[in-house]
Swiss-Prot record:
Alphabetized Gene3D superfamilies for the sequence: Nucleoside diphosphate kinase-like domain
Complex and partners: Homotetramer.
Subcellular localization(s) per the UniProt record: Cytoplasm
Catalysed reactions listed for this entry: a 2'-deoxyribonucleoside 5'-diphosphate + ATP = a 2'-deoxyribonucleoside 5'-triphosphate + ADP; a ribonucleoside 5'-diphosphate + ATP = a ribonucleoside 5'-triphosphate + ADP
Descriptive protein name: Nucleoside diphosphate kinase
Pfam families listed in its UniProt record: NDK
Enzyme Commission number(s) from the entry: 2.7.4.6
Length: 143
């Protein structure tokens, strides 16, 4: 077991439906700690930078339109094996394939409007935290 950090986004569909508290309760109930949190309205350029690995995929434009339509909540969660734990709590990207009790099974509307995003590896967590929370990243690395 190792102490890890992950970026988590509570996406616009969940924010619009007042699910922030319910989703945070799941993470905190699993022993994860909130290290940073901010509500943000992101623009197209920022969204495209975050989702750059999906640029050539068919769903890219609809994903960018969705993620920029209204505010979202960005947070850094920390805990033992946080990346795998969070991904397990979130469930499969497609809510119909997600296990019962997971965040996406409970709250997601579709494969795109799936309520949450989380880093999928240590490398992506570092990259995403640096993008979303540059001051926190700088303080962690540079003291």
């Amino acid at each position: 077991m190792r102490l890890e950090k992950s970026l988590v986004l509570i996406k616009p569909d969940a924010v619009e439906r007042n699910l922030i508290g319910k989703i945070l309760e799941v993470y905190e109930g699993a022993g994860l700690k909130i290290k940073a949190m901010e509500m943000k309205q992101i623009n197209k350029d920022f969204a495209e930078k975050h989702y750059e690995e999906h640029r050539d995929k068919q769903f890219f434009n609809s994903l960018i339109k969705y993620i920029t339509r209204s505010p979202l909540v960005a947070l850094i969660l920390e805990g033992e094996d946080a990346i795998d734990k969070i991904r397990s709590l979130n469930g499969a990207t497609n809510p119909e394939k997600a296990e019962f009790g997971t965040i996406r099974r409970r709250f997601a509307l579709s494969g795109t409007e799936n309520s949450v995003h989380a880093s999928d590896s240590i490398e992506s967590a570092e990259k995403e935290i640096k993008l979303w929370f540059p001051k926190v990243f700088y303080e962690e690395i540079c003291g």
